[in-house]
Design a protein with these regions (language model features):
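Juxtamembrane cytosolic amphipathic helices that cap and anchor the N-termini
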Residues: 22-37, 84-101, 204
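Helix-to-loop junctions at the C-terminal end of transmembrane segments
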Residues: 157-170, 265
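A late C-terminal transmembrane helix in Major Facilitator Superfamily
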Residues: 233-269
């Protein structure tokens, strides 16, 4: 009943789509956008089956953007205006930094339970012939019990990142959390390697979980700082589309992180995934410094 009552007095709210036209016209616009998503999703699934993930994803993204550009009708001028963000170099720098923060947060949310289940769900056992083999860990920690803690901390601390950024500047906060994530990623990878090859992986679980929570906290704070930076760097017309674009690209972290983690765990080298993430975070350090913190930065400390 409260949900129905909530509709009364809300006729002053604007619709999501400005000037939607007739119901048939509005439905056509929505159907067209969904159609683009469906076609590119099909193409992406096919591309992923025949080529490397690092090629399939960019192809899918470029195809989606290209098809959106071809949508006819009165929606086209609005899309064209939004596409102006791609000529701004800060769109690309902030895309990289948003992958660092939001992409890591959403990616680790999927990768953490996978890591707990596979790395700590099994253990090494010495056979009668002296050979090592992986067997089920009878006292394995449950992913359902522990995996929620990381995303919870990251989501809870995000507003703190925005508040600190208002005081210090978003880029300084982003730089600090980038350093934290580089160090924590390397440390987590090392602990994962020890646990994966141990006859007692449970002895490493507490440290493993703490390090992951540190990365979640850093990515949550960084999510607040990069959000603040986008609002500072871009004008009123561009910051909305930029935020939508960076969020959409960073959301691929939910696919990439667990996939990379799963591949490396299957290969017996889970630490390689974390070391790879650490390299990316180091690149983000350089990007953030070059664009926003060096002496002659394009925009100083947004």
């Amino acid at each position: 009943p409260l949900a129905f009552a909530g509709w009364f007095g809300m006729n002053n709210l604007k619709v999501v789509t400005p000037n939607p036209g007739s119901p048939i016209s509005a439905f056509g616009k929505i159907l067209g956008l969904y159609g683009v998503g469906l076609l590119t999703s099909i193409a992406g699934v096919w591309a992923l089956s025949v080529m490397n993930m690092w090629l399939a994803l960019p192809i899918t993204i470029v195809l989606t953007v290209a098809l959106l550009r071809l949508i006819p009708g009165d929606i086209k001028p609005n899309i064209k205006n939004q596409f102006a963000i791609f000529s701004n170099k800060h769109t690309w720098s902030m895309t990289v930094l948003y992958i660092l923060t939001f992409g890591s947060f959403i990616g680790f949310s999927a990768a953490l339970p996978l890591s707990i289940s596979v790395i700590f769900g099994n253990m090494m056992e010495v056979g009668a012939d002296g050979a090592m083999a992986r067997v089920v860990n009878p006292d394995a920690p449950s992913a359902l019990t522990w995996a929620w803690m990381g995303p919870f901390v990251g989501a809870l601390i995000r507003p703190v990142g925005g508040w600190i950024s208002d005081k210090m500047g978003g880029s300084i906060v982003t730089q600090i959390i980038s350093v934290v994530m580089v160090v924590a990623s390397v440390a987590t990878g090392y602990v994962m390697m020890l646990a994966y090859n141990s006859t007692d992986p449970n002895s490493y679980f507490a440290l493993f979980l703490i390090l992951f929570i540190v990365m979640f906290a850093a990515s949550g704070i960084g999510n607040g700082s990069t959000f603040r930076s986008i609002g500072f760097i871009f004008n009123q017309q561009q910051k909305g589309p930029v935020l939508g674009w960076t969020s959409a690209i960073a959301a691929y972290g939910a696919f990439i992180a667990p996939r990379v983690m799963g591949q490396e765990i299957q290969a017996g080298t889970p630490e390689v995934a974390m070391y790879g993430f650490a390299v990316f975070y180091a690149v983000c350090l350089v990007v953030n410094w070059w664009f926003y913190l060096r002496k002659n930065a394009y925009i100083k400390n947004p």
